[in-house]
C-alpha cells in the first residue's frame, strides 16, 4: 500500500528519507522533516534506468485514473506550482513505483524516482 504524506507547512508532497540514521518524511519543497514512528517501516532505493528501457508515452489530453491535483510541486518548464500526480509501477514489482507529474499550466509531464 502506498501512502502519500503532505507537508503541514506548505502542502507539498513529502518523501521518505534517512536523516541522521533515522527514517523521516521530508518535504520536497520547504525541507520540513517529520520523524517516522518506529512501528512504521520505510524502505527506499534508487533505481538507475538505462536508455534501452521502455518509455511510457501519454497522449496530451490523457490522464490516468486516480490522478490527483497537488500544489507545491514546481514545473521544470514554467515554474507553475500546481500539477496532477499519479503513481505507476513501471518496473519490477520488487522495485519502487514511479511518480509522474503533469503541469496544470503548460502540460509538461515529468517523473520522479525514489
Curated annotation (Swiss-Prot):
Binds 2 Zn(2+) ions. Keywords: Activator, DNA-directed RNA polymerase, Metal-binding, Nucleotidyltransferase, Transcription, Transcription regulation, Transferase, Zinc, Zinc-finger. One of its GO terms (cellular component) is DNA-directed RNA polymerase complex. GO terms for biological process: DNA-templated transcription; positive regulation of DNA-templated transcription. The active site is at residues 94-95. Its cofactor is Zn(2+). Has 2 zinc-ribbon domains (N-ZR and C-ZR); functionally important residues Asp-94 and Glu-95 are probably located at the tip of a domain that extends from C-ZR into the RNAP active site. The nature of these residues determines if the protein is involved in stalled transcript cleavage and thus activation (Asp and Glu residues in this protein, TFS1) or in RNAP inhibition (Lys residues in TFS4). Induces RNA cleavage activity in the RNA polymerase. Induces rapid cleavage of a stalled transcription elongation complex with a 2-nucleotide reduction at the 3' end of the nascent RNA. Truncated RNA is able to resume elongation. During transcription elongation it enhances processivity. Involved in transcriptional proofreading and fidelity. Misincorporation of nucleotides during elongation of transcription leads to arrested elongation complexes which are rescued by TFS-promoted removal of a dinucleotide from the 3'-end. This is Transcription factor S1. It comes from Saccharolobus solfataricus (strain ATCC 35092 / DSM 1617 / JCM 11322 / P2). The gene is tfs1.
